[in-house]
C-alpha cells in the first residue's frame, strides 16, 4: 500500500521505515552504485534499494524492488541476507523539516550486468566500483560504505 504524500510524511516524522538494500556484485567483484536523485541522500552514490510497504511480504517487496531498482524481478532466494542496519538522515523525502530513520535489511546479490535494465527513476547514473574504490569515494554515502567497512560488524548490528 502506497500512502498519500501527507500521510507518508506523518509516518516518516514519527516512525522508522523498513527497507531493503541490494549489495549487487558483478562477475569482477565490483559493486553497483546509483547516484540518488531524491532525498534523503540526494546526490550521493548509494546501493539500490527501497521501502517495504504495509501489508507487503518480504518476498513481494524483494521482487517489486529488484524490478524497480534493477530492472529485473528476482525472488528473495536470489539474495543472501547480509544483516540488519540502521540509517539515519537529517532530511526526508520532501524537505529538511524532519529526519528519516530506516531499519534496513541488507541482501547481497550476484547478477550479470547484461541481465540488468537499470531504470532512471531513482538514480541519475550508475557505476561499478570495487569495495576499495567504494570505501575511498568521497561522494559514496556513508551508509553504503558501511557495508564494506572493516570496522562494521559482519552482519549489520
Curated annotation (Swiss-Prot):
Catalyzed reaction equations? GDP-alpha-D-mannose + H2O = D-mannose + GDP + H(+)
Documented EC number(s)? 3.6.1.-
Where does the chain bind Mg(2+)? 49, 69, 122
Q: Which GO molecular-function terms appear in the entry?
A: GDP-mannose mannosyl hydrolase activity; magnesium ion binding; manganese ion binding
Signal sequence, renumbered to the chain: none
What EC class is this?
hydrolase
Extract the Pfam families matched here. NUDIX (PF00293)
Q: Which residues bind substrate?
A: 2-3, 8, 36
Q: How is the cofactor bound?
A: Binds 1 Mg(2+) ion per subunit.
Keyword entries, A-Z: Hydrolase, Magnesium, Metal-binding
Q: Where is the Nudix hydrolase domain positioned along the sequence?
A: 3-153
Q: Which cofactors, if any, are listed as required? A: Mg(2+)
Intervals of motif Nudix box: 50-71
Q: Look up the domain of life of the source.
A: Bacteria
The UniProt function text for this chain reads: Hydrolyzes GDP-mannose.
Which family is this protein grouped under? Answer: Belongs to the Nudix hydrolase family.
Matching entries from PANTHER family are given as: GDP-MANNOSE MANNOSYL HYDROLASE
Spell out the subunit comment.
Answer: Homodimer.
Task: Tell me what this protein is called.
Answer: GDP-mannose mannosyl hydrolase
In which organism is this protein found?
Salmonella typhi
Amino acid at each position: 500500500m502506497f500512502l498519500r504524500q501527507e500521510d507518508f510524511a506523518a509516518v516518516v516524522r514519527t516512525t522508522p521505515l523498513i527497507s531493503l538494500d541490494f549489495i549487487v556484485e558483478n562477475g569482477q567483484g565490483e559493486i553497483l552504485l546509483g547516484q540518488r536523485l531524491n532525498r534523503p541522500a540526494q546526490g550521493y552514490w548509494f546501493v539500490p534499494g527501497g521501502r517495504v510497504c504495509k501489508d507487503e511480504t518480504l518476498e513481494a517487496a524483494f521482487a517489486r524492488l529488484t524490478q524497480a531498482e534493477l530492472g529485473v524481478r528476482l525472488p528473495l532466494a536470489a539474495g543472501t541476507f547480509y544483516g540488519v542496519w540502521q540509517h539515519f538522515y537529517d532530511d526526508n523525502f520532501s524537505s529538511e523539516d524532519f529526519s528519516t530513520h530506516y531499519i534496513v535489511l541488507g541482501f547481497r546479490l550476484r547478477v550479470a550486468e547484461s541481465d540488468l535494465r537499470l531504470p532512471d527513476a531513482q538514480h541519475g547514473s550508475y557505476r561499478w566500483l570495487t569495495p576499495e574504490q567504494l570505501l575511498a569515494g568521497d561522494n559514496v554515502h556513508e551508509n553504503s560504505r558501511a557495508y564494506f567497512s572493516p570496522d562494521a560488524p559482519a552482519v549489520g548490528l
